[in-house]
A protein has these predicted regions:
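Glycine-rich phosphate/adenylate-binding loop and adjacent beta-alpha elements
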Residues: 1-35
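Mid-domain Rossmann-like dinucleotide-binding core that forms the NAD(H)/NADP(H) cofactor-binding site
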Residues: 42-125
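Short, acidic/turn-prone active-site loops that include or flank metal/cofactor-
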Residues: 107, 125-130, 165-166
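Short loop/helix-cap segments at secondary-structure boundaries that form the rim of catalytic
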Residues: 112-117, 130-132, 163
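A short acidic, Gly/Pro-enriched loop at the edge of an enzyme's catalytic core
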Residues: 128-138
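Glycine-rich, N-terminal phosphate-binding loop of Rossmann-like dinucleotide-binding domains
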Residues: 142
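Glycine-rich phosphate-binding loop and adjacent beta-alpha segment
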Residues: 145-166
Length: 166
């Protein structure tokens, strides 16, 4: 039923001590409902990005359902310019029509990569241009204590924070 609420749940490669090996183990036991067969039309070089794309799409759809304004009219901050942050940004801008978005990351190379694909302002998080109480929606794709605090500072009163990173 609600496995995600179980106090004794075990997550692949995530529990300490590790009780269940992760995805790089030689063999892994996974419940049937968690296995998806990839379509034959999906190329092998595209398959690895299916999971992060699904995670990003799910997060964007959660934000869309939870917030009263449309995504295209919302001011959005994405904390983290890695795979999930970039994919979330792509879905927000290319699919949902979000016009005002900012991506923050410590890594200059990631910010440059994001700016190639997104029409979004890219900044390091210590920049004075990251505004407090400014954003309708904040996506934290990093999941560290410091990024949680950045999200709390950046979101407007009444805005929402979507925590994606673990």
């Amino acid at each position: 039923g609600n496995e995600h609420l179980c106090g004794k749940r075990i997550i692949l490669g995530m529990n300490k001590p590790i009780e269940r090996q992760g995805g790089f183990a030689e063999y892994v036991s996974i419940p049937d409902q968690n296995i998806y067969e990839l379509p034959k039309t999906l190329e092998m070089k595209e398959a690895p990005i299916a999971e992060p794309t699904a995670v990003s799409l799910h997060a964007v759809e959660l934000a869309e359902k939870a917030y009263y304004k449309s995504l295209k009219d919302s001011k959005v901050l994405v904390i983290g310019g890695g795979a999930i942050g970039l994919l979330s940004g792509l879905i927000l801008s290319k699919v949902k029509g979000c016009k005002e978005m900012m991506i923050v990351d410590l890594n200059e190379k990631r910010l440059k990569e994001c700016s190639k694909y997104l029409d979004a302002q890219t900044l390091k998080p210590d920049s004075k241009n990251v505004m407090n109480d400014h954003f309708d929606i904040v996506f934290d794709t990093v999941g560290m204590e410091v990024t949680r605090q950045q999200a709390i500072k950046a979101v407007k009163p009444g805005g929402i924070i979507i925590h994606i990173g673990l």
